[in-house]
A protein has these predicted regions:
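Conserved beta-strand positions in the central sheet of alpha/beta enzyme cores
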Residues: 69, 107-109, 169-172, 211, ...
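Short, acidic/polar
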Residues: 86-99, 148-162, 217-224, 299-302
Length: 322
């Protein structure tokens, strides 16, 4: 085995250098990007990306997954031709997808609620131009309000229609852990029979991998892991601030990742840049990082932190501009 670069810092030392002070950086930007506002892009701070340098992880089912995944919640917008509002710029979306695929990205993550409900359609139109077997498409059961069985199943089928596919590679119970905790989880997925339906869809092959994304109560996280259900993956918020200093309703990523790793459940990572804040550190922290690796962007440190953990399958980035 080759020796590691002597200049490479351990994660522990890196955490000591950046510390929790990184959390005080600029505010995050969410939702689809407004026209002419590229600041919401996480990719724009990474610099030039080599075409042949993508890292891939192999899932327990043998899928070759790009370590960088495309989060499709911030598609660029343009003025609507017949109204005062904005619509997704499909030509721009196509260009972004082309660039991502050319650089090795094959995992695309969306939801029925992203971009005011239009992300799946735009994502599906862009991806339809490529061989389906070359792509890994992830979307979600985002039944936050009307979670009857009928409405939830309708949402599931509508997702496949919008994405122009007859199967989903990765399907998630969206944002588990909020509301009234375990009660809300039961209302959304158990008492209405929706989880049983999705398990049957996985058995039939229309869902290749079934998992959930987590925000909120650690009791709900532990509860889902205790169920007699084989989860293929779980999506968690993980970055070097949230690792041990999660704020608000979030749980320390060190705990979340550790619980998944010891069960052999792959982790998909969201918010590696904490909504963009970890690309905008204060001058003191930037200087310390540049002293170690002057050629690397500030954001690249955050991506490397998330991507170096062996049980991480994919690190998502919401990219509006490249």
């Amino acid at each position: 085995m080759e020796k590691r670069d002597k200049e490479e810092m351990s994660r522990r030392k890196f955490l000591k250098i950046v510390g929790v002070s990184a959390a005080a950086s600029a505010a995050a930007l969410y939702g689809c990007a407004s026209e002419g506002k590229p600041a919401s892009s996480e990719a724009s701070v990474l610099g030039e990306v080599p075409v042949d340098k993508m890292t891939y992880r192999v899932s327990p089912k043998g899928e070759r997954v790009s370590l960088l995944g495309y989060g499709c919640m911030r598609w660029p917008l343009k003025p609507a031709p017949d109204s005062d509002g904005n619509v997704i710029d499909q030509d721009a979306v196509n260009e972004l997808v082309d660039y991502a695929i050319a650089h090795g990205v094959n995992y695309f993550d969306t939801s029925p609620v992203y971009c005011q409900g239009f992300s799946e359609r735009a994502t599906g139109a862009a991806l339809k131009r490529y061989p389906r077997e070359k792509l890994l498409i992830a979307t979600k059961m985002s039944n936050f309000q009307n979670y009857t069985r009928e409405n939830s199943i309708k949402m599931y089928h509508q997702s496949m229609k919008e994405l122009q596919t007859d199967y989903l590679d990765y399907y998630l119970l969206h944002s588990v852990g909020g509301g009234e905790g375990i009660k809300t989880f039961h209302d959304r997925y158990i008492d209405n029979g929706v989880l049983d339906f999705l398990l049957k869809e996985r058995e039939e092959g229309r869902i290749r991998n079934l998992g959930w994304s987590f925000h909120g109560s650690v009791e709900v996280f532990d509860y889902l892991l205790s169920l007699d259900v084989k989860w293929d993956f779980v999506q968690i918020q993980m970055n070097y601030v949230d690792w041990r200093h999660a704020s608000g309703r979030n749980v320390n990523a060190e705990y979340l990742y550790g619980e998944l790793a010891k069960r052999g459940i792959p982790a998909v990572i969201m918010e590696p840049l904490l909504g963009g804040r970890l690309s905008k550190l204060n001058d003191h922290l930037v200087a310390r990082l540049k002293q170690r690796r002057p050629e690397n962007s500030v954001a690249s440190w955050a991506f490397r932190f998330a991507g170096t953990y062996p049980n991480v399958l994919c690190v998502l980035s919401g990219m509006t501009y490249m």
